[in-house]
Amino acid sequence: MTVDRTVLIGRPLRAATYTVSEIDVNDFLGVVAEPDFAPADGSEGGAEAASGRLAPPSFAPFVAVLGLLKTFDWQEDFLFDYRTGTAMFGEQAIEFHRPLLVGESVAISAAISDVYEKQGKQTFDVIEVTFDIKSREEGDLLMSGQQSYNLFK
């Protein structure tokens, strides 16, 4: 059965939240070289002292990916059964508006902006999702962008 996913264009996805935790940032810094950022070691006041410190800029795409995964259901929103199908992340573009802070809670809003078919060794649909990520407290825009998902037929 062929699925026409173009009917999804314009569909808003679920709102989601993510908190930039010290644990996630420290785990991230354990595998990514960020010379100007060091994992917090728990001294100098522990989590309270770490809260409010800048997260490394390279952590922002991680927040975008994790946050976006909370905004959709593969079957309901993409008409795709991930248990029997193959999906891959595609391109990602992010515009940064201000740094993320450790301890900050963010709100993610997203919508399906485009769907089109491509042909490689296999035919697949590309679903493009645009998103905004804002501070939950102040509501200021932290980052905006686009993420695509490749759904193989």
Language model features with spans:
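Hot-dog-fold acyl-thioester-processing enzymes
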Residues: 1-91
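HotDog/MaoC-like acyl-thioester-processing domains
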Residues: 1-3, 96-153
